[in-house]
């Protein structure tokens, strides 16, 4: 598994506060049964959310659509 860093995510969402909110909302979606957009590979929802952000699969649009 490739190591995901905050810097990788900040390349996609430059504002670190927005990036944190996006990761939190997406991790909550995953923890209540949301489908991951990447291969889970036994990762926790927070890591999966960060991987999705770093690959550009999840963005700030999630902030307006709500948590679930």
UniProtKB/Swiss-Prot annotation:
GO terms for molecular function: DNA binding; DNA-directed RNA polymerase activity. The keyword Transferase applies. It holds the Pfam family RNA_pol_Rpb6. It is an enzyme of class 2 (transferase). Its EC number is 2.7.7.6. GO terms for cellular component: DNA-directed RNA polymerase complex. GO terms for biological process: DNA-templated transcription. InterPro entries: DNA-dir_RNA_pol_omega, Pol_omega/Rpo6/RPB6, RPB6/omega-like_sf. It catalyses: RNA(n) + a ribonucleoside 5'-triphosphate = RNA(n+1) + diphosphate. Signal peptide: none annotated. Keywords: DNA-directed RNA polymerase, Nucleotidyltransferase, Transcription, Transferase. Promotes RNA polymerase assembly. Latches the N- and C-terminal regions of the beta' subunit thereby facilitating its interaction with the beta and alpha subunits. NCBIfam families: rpoZ. Belongs to the RNA polymerase subunit omega family. The RNAP catalytic core consists of 2 alpha, 1 beta, 1 beta' and 1 omega subunit. When a sigma factor is associated with the core the holoenzyme is formed, which can initiate transcription. This is DNA-directed RNA polymerase subunit omega. It comes from Nitrosospira multiformis (strain ATCC 25196 / NCIMB 11849 / C 71). The gene is rpoZ.
């Amino acid at each position: 598994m490739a190591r995901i860093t905050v810097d990788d995510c900040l390349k996609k969402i430059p504002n670190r506060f927005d990036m944190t909110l996006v990761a939190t909302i997406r991790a909550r979606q995953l923890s209540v049964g949301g489908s991951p957009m990447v291969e889970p590979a036994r990762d926790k929802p927070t890591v999966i959310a960060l991987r999705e952000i770093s690959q550009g699969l999840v963005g700030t649009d999630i902030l307006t659509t709500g948590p679930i």
